[in-house]
């Protein structure tokens, strides 16, 4: 992953702004007051994903969303990074995702 020539490129300031606003909006309580609390939610991340603060941020998001959803699940893949659907455990990730969709 680190040696991939398509990774590690410089991103625009706009991308960072969009990401920051998305993270900020994810933690705004008023956005969750008028939604269906019974919809299934699955949070997927790699344990080595710096975007998810090496799983700590992902766990914080999960704990926050548990206040609003009755059917919330989290799956953190050990030793995977950000793109779990194309990482070393992609078969396991797709299998778990398929199972979640089929039982949701």
Task: Describe the function of each predicted region.
Residues 26, 68-104:
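Catalytic active-site module of serine/aspartate enzymes centered on a nucleophile-bearing elbow/loop
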Residues 18-21, 59-60, 92, 96-99:
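Alpha-helical elements of Rossmann-like donor-binding domains used by nucleotide-donor carbohydrate transfer enzymes
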Residues 37, 43-45, 49:
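Short beta-strand/loop motif that positions the catalytic acidic residue
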Residues 50-60:
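Conserved alpha/beta-hydrolase "acid-adjacent" motif
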Residues 1:
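Divalent metal-coordination and catalytic microenvironments
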Residues 44, 58-59, 74-77:
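Structured catalytic core of nucleotide-sugar glycosyltransferases
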Residues 32-37, 67-68:
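Short, conserved loop/helix-junction motifs that constitute active-site signature segments
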Residues 7, 11-33:
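Active-site nucleophile elbow and catalytic-triad environment of alpha/beta-hydrolase enzymes
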């Amino acid at each position: 992953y680190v040696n991939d020539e398509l990774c590690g490129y410089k991103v625009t300031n706009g991308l960072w702004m969009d990401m920051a606003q998305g993270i900020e909006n994810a933690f705004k309580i008023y956005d969750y007051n008028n939604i269906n609390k019974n919809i299934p939610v699955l949070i997927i991340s790699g344990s080595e994903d710096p975007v998810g603060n090496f799983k700590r941020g992902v766990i914080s998001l999960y704990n926050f969303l548990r206040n609003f959803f009755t059917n919330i699940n989290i799956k953190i893949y050990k030793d995977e990074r950000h793109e779990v659907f194309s990482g070393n455990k992609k078969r396991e990730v797709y299998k778990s995702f398929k199972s979640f969709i089929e039982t949701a």
